[in-house]
Amino acid sequence: SDERSKAWPNIKASRQDIELSTRLNVESYLHTLKAIVPGMIKRRKGHVVLMGSLAGLYPQMSTVYGGQKGAIHRIAQSLRIELSGSRVKVSEICPGRTKTNFGKAAFTDKNKAKKFMSGFTLLEPRDIADAIMFALSVRWRSNISTIEISGTEQSPGGVPIIPDKDPILS
């Protein structure tokens, strides 16, 4: 079967999968921002950290997921402009493949999930936490806008350097 996944759907994605992943990957961010940003503006202090993805910055075989994460990238950029002068910072962390449950949740085919998350050293959740802490640690006059972080065996965009090792491409 050519069914790639639930969370990495291409044009064969079901309407239900697209709607569910859009609620998770875009709408939840917007609702959370609506809830927390006004208080930060009022206090004239705060730091919004959005979790993007390299899939949102670089074209990959993930039309829906990549598009949703691309929306997060644009939201982060636009929010930073909207909050200019408010003393509220906005940072976006864009990781590549990371050792999480994403592969299990994203793929309906367990073998593809395992293959997707193997063949090279993945980032650890701690690597992402360190990137977040770095963004939060800079002085008030500085803002880290975007951090791209991938494993050393991944090329820009998070796709493995050797394409035949990528289950999406092979």
Show the residue positions of the predicted features.
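Hydrophobic positions on the long internal alpha-helix
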Residues: T32-I36, I75-A76
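Catalytic Tyr-X3-Lys loop
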Residues: I11-L30, K45, V49, I72
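Active-site helix of classical SDR
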Residues: L33, Q68-K69
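C-terminal helical subdomain
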Residues: E92-I93, N111-G158, I162-D164
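Residue(s) in the substrate-gating loop at a strand-loop-helix junction
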Residues: S53
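Alpha-helical segment proximal to the catalytic Tyr-Lys
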Residues: P38, I81-S84
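Active-site loop-to-helix junction immediately N-terminal to the catalytic Tyr of the SDR YXXXK motif
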Residues: W8-P9, A13, P59-G67, S78
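A short helix-coil junction within the Rossmann-fold of NAD(P)-dependent oxidoreductases
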Residues: R4, W8, A35-R44
